[in-house]
Amino acid sequence: RSSAASDVYKRQCLWKVIGNPVMMAALQIPPISPEIADFIAAKTGAPAHGIMFNSDQWDGYQWDRYRLTSMIAKNNIKNVVAVTGDIHMSFANDIYEKFDGNMKGRRVAVEFVGPSVTAANVDDILADKVGLKLPENDPLFDTVDKALQTTNQHIRWCQCSKHGYVVVEMNRKFAQADWFFVNNKSNSRSGQHWGNSWATNEGTSALYPVKKPLKF
């Protein structure tokens, strides 16, 4: 993870892309007692608004993450984009220099996280571990998505139950990610549909929603 800092610093291209194995943005689980949250934050440096979802992500390597984000901020490096997999879910994230929960700090990068085509995510985990089998479009998953975004305000959009892939395209003006979801993960001929799109303009390090994909 620490090598990402030197790689970004040395690149002279317009877009500095980090091929990222695990989610960079903080992912906290809501909710816990404010007193407990403050205690954890004081002892560990973790964001004070939740408990980390997975310590194998960059949340478990917070000093390395801050080393990267502070280097980007200090050197005023523009157009850093992390393209991430592993978590099997879809996220569009603003990356801040510090993930302290108030979202008043400096944005230094963006992150596009792609889902899995067939590997387990939230709906499969509920079915396998709890025995609760729900369709991917069940309202429960919308509630989960909204709760994660409320707790993690740097997460501009997330989709935790649908399967598919993300296409990222970059040009001189912007970088855009288009998420597509398969209609039926058990049927390779079921087709696909567009899910959502987010983009960042050159020089801004901030995401905004897009009404349609670049290509389908």
Q: What residues fall within each predicted segment?
A:
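Long, structured stretches of catalytic cores involved in phosphate-ester chemistry, encompassing
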Residues: S3-F216
